[in-house]
UniProtKB/Swiss-Prot annotation:
Cysteines joined through disulfide linkages: C225-C240, C230-C233, C285-C351, C352-C409
Main location: Golgi
Residues reported in the UniProt entry to bind Mn(2+): D166, D329
GO biological process: proteoglycan biosynthetic process
Protein name as catalogued: Glycosaminoglycan xylosylkinase homolog
Amino acid sequence: MNKRSVIIAGIVASLLGLALGANFYFMYYLSAEEGHLASVRALENMIRHKMRHLKPNYLNRNPRFFMFRNKLLKNYKAAPYENASVLWDIANWWPHENEVYPLYDSSMGQLLETLRREPITRVSNLGRGTQLKLLVRLSHQQKVIFKPQWYPREEVIDGMIYSGKDRHTAEVYAFYLGAVLDFRWTPIVVGRVVNLKKEIYAKGDPELQQTINIETDEDGREKYCLFGKCHYCNEEETVCGDERHNIEGVLIYIVPGTLAKRRSPWQRTYKDDKRAPWEDDMTYCKSLKNKMETIRLLDLIDASIFDYLIQNGDRHHYETREERVVLIDNGKAFGNPNKDHLDILAPLYQCCLLRKSTWDRLQVFSGGVLTEIIDRLSKQDALYPLITDKHKKGVERRLLVVYAVVEHCMDIEGDKMFKTL
């Protein structure tokens, strides 16, 4: 073979290699109209690649964290109070659009103590919904919702992402996570140990009392067990007090104002043999961008990051207050610390949009400090520790995934993916 033939053969081989490489690239990325990946599996492969090559700033502590940490610790520190009625008024005055409470307010520490300490004056069943909840009145007729404990902290919930009953401490953790990430769209929540006999049964209305079974053993000791009233409530599944009739639970401050319930565009089918369109269509968001206001879409993308971190895959509907998304009902989080359901992030990786303020805030809590600050904030709660170490590791692992997904979107959209709405 002469020199010219060798050169030609080399050029042909190079072109063939480029063609095959390009073909692989476009099959893998499926530039499909806007450069979206072909499937969730392709996305997962890309995320793994991104996570192996994350920039050091995502793995190390952000120097700005310490300023945020000090402000948060000061704001949420338990504080004594004198007049609960005044604090109820302040909390009812706080909400603006979907912001349930202000970024910083000296009354927050007092309000949390008020929720922990004010006496229960009346209790009734809150029949709506699928989960057991009670409507509790505290002093000055302030209404709150009570959710009881169903599982010990370390129990792993197997099955689908939405399996099992509510995890009570997830509601408290969601409150602190929202405060830290500036998603102040959750209700204010505290943990509280209540006496099923003296505070629930004795203060309950006749209908509630009928949903509490009282058993007496051979030694004359009573056992109180609550089954309540809801869609799935029944006498075979009860919450029982300990030897002193105490049960763990959470008190959830009812968000003032009118809330509208809306179906999520990323709703699951809840059927094993049927998938929703968004689960297979990586360009699903394209049509939504033409139908939905950008501010609403950005709210839902923020919500998806919030839900992904705690693994709440049950937001089939969402609530709005003054046309802005609020994060009500966060109890289906922290089911299995070893699983990360990436599809909860579908709004982010399908739309490749994100608020600039959200992205800036997420980066403040890099390097393992997100769970550290929430742990410190929640030490004053009656139910501390709220989650296990395995769940904490899961939160930090998922934050790295969020960083990787945003990096992937930046490869496609550049800085134009960030919005200031």
